[in-house]
Swiss-Prot record:
Pfam families: PIG-L (PF02585). Transmembrane segments: none annotated. Coiled coil: none annotated. Its cofactor is Zn(2+). It comes from the Bacteria. InterPro entries: GlcNAc_PI_deacetylase-related, LmbE-like_dom_sf, Mycothiol_biosynthesis_MshB. It catalyses: 1D-myo-inositol 2-acetamido-2-deoxy-alpha-D-glucopyranoside + H2O = 1D-myo-inositol 2-amino-2-deoxy-alpha-D-glucopyranoside + acetate. Belongs to the MshB deacetylase family. Binds 1 zinc ion per subunit. Its EC number is 3.5.1.103. SUPFAM superfamilies: LmbE-like. HAMAP family: MshB. This is 1D-myo-inositol 2-acetamido-2-deoxy-alpha-D-glucopyranoside deacetylase.
Length: 283
């Protein structure tokens, strides 16, 4: 299984439980991250001077440590933890920041990479690792981040190249939030909003209609490890005292889900009951 993400913390927020579950099942799980997340907004004062804009520009290196800690938390206790893996090597491409930010003008920003280069690097990884399942973002980049959208596009292009030479079908999934799961989580969260946090406004958190979701993975057994992994990304994520919600630097309440949701998008996807195992149908 290969999970393709843009920045450290995306892997845990979107797919942390799924990573932990399949590691528990003995699957060879690799987490590939495109950038170091140099443009992340730091929570609190302790590490605030690591930022790029007006600071030491050391946040990316620090976040490698956070990602390492998060993957260790997601890994089965007593075993060898999953190690971070960066496209082109750590630091090859840089976090582009949000749309319209000055960070997008940096010469190493991911959005300035010639499209063929990251596609070629990812194609080589797909050919050498030969995953049976690939997980990434939807075409909107989950919430519109330019790097997330580019990761989606690069992944789709690399998969298309591999399909031309590899007869085995790769199951491809986009990680999404199910609408009813989000609403249920927010109803529960409204009873325990931490001081200084706020509930999201209507439509502020993206979600998909339930009918579009094709796979639902039960990660309740791995839930505590997912929470620990979120806490490992301390510059970016605050976990509520209840352990049931988290917030980014904007202090907007977001539920921590015990089920993670996906939409299958490869050519062999067919309508039918929701999958409960992403390896269904793989011999």
């Amino acid at each position: 299984m290969l999970l393709v993400h843009a920045h450290p913390d995306d892997e845990t927020i979107m797919t942390g439980g799924t990573i932990a579950r399949y590691l528990d099942e003995g699957v060879d799980v690799r987490v590939l991250t495109f950038t170091l997340g140099e443009e992340g907004e730091v929570i609190g004062d302790r590490w605030a001077q690591l930022v790029a804009d007006g600071g030491a520009d050391q946040l990316g290196g620090f976040r490698i440590g956070e990602l390492t800690g998060a993957l260790a938390a997601l890994s089965p206790p007593g075993g060898s933890p999953v190690q971070p893996w960066f496209l082109g090597g750590a630091g090859r491409w840089r976090d582009s920041g949000m749309a319209g930010s000055a960070a997008a003008r940096h010469p190493r920003a991911l959005v300035n990479a010639g499209f063929d280069e990251p596609v070629g690097v990812l194609t080589d990884i797909l050919e050498s690792f030969a995953p049976q399942v690939v997980i990434t973002y939807d075409s909107a980049g989950t919430y519109g981040h330019p790097d997330h959208k580019l990761v989606h596009e690069v992944t789709a292009a690399a998969l298309a190249r591999v399909a031309a030479s590899r007869p085995e079908q790769i199951k491809v999934y986009e990680s999404v939030t199910e609408h009813s799961a989000l609403q249920a989580g927010l109803v529960a969260a409204a009873r325990r909003v931490p001081d200084g946090w706020r509930m999201p406004g209507p439509g502020e958190l993206p979600s998909y209609p339930d009918a579009m979701v094709t796979a639902e993975i039960d990660v309740r057994t791995q839930y505590d490890r997912k929470v620990a992994a979120l806490a490992a990304h301390a510059t970016q994520v605050t976990v509520a005292p209840s352990g049931t919600e988290y917030a980014l630097s904007n202090n907007i309440v977001q539920p921590i889900f015990g089920h993670e949701h996906f939409i299958r998008v490869d050519a062999a996807a067919v309508a039918g009951p929701r999958e409960t195992d992403l390896f269904d149908g793989i011999g």
